[in-house]
Amino acid sequence: MPFSKVSGVNNAHKVMVYALSTCVWCKKIKQFLRDNNVEFEYIDADLCEEGEKARIREELQSKSGSLSYPTVIVDDKIVIVGFKEDNLKEALGI
């Protein structure tokens, strides 16, 4: 899948963001991560080709049990659905 990478000095965790380009909460999560200098990768699912969209849906369903955006996965084990600042801070140690 074509993820985009945002560099940051806070790179102790692998952070993956599944988002939609038009989603306000998705934009807030990306900005929160940038503001805290967190390195992360993201994909705007709505901008992908149909085959990629299907793979994203399968991956989200298997990892989070839902198809909600935004979904953040930290270190392939912590799943945060929605913009939950306190959960993000705890998972990232910031």
Predicted regions and their residues:
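Local sequence-structure signature of Cys/Sec-based thiol-disulfide redox active-site neighborhoods
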Residues: P2-E41
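Short alpha-helical
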Residues: V24-W25, G51, D86-N87
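Structural signal for short hydrophobic segments within the conserved structured cores
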Residues: E41-I43, I78-I80
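Thioredoxin-like thiol-disulfide oxidoreductase module
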Residues: A45-S66, G93-I94
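A short, hydrophobic beta-strand/beta-hairpin element that forms part of a small beta-sheet core
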Residues: P70-V79
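Thiol-/selenol-based redox modules, centered on thioredoxin-like
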Residues: D86-I94
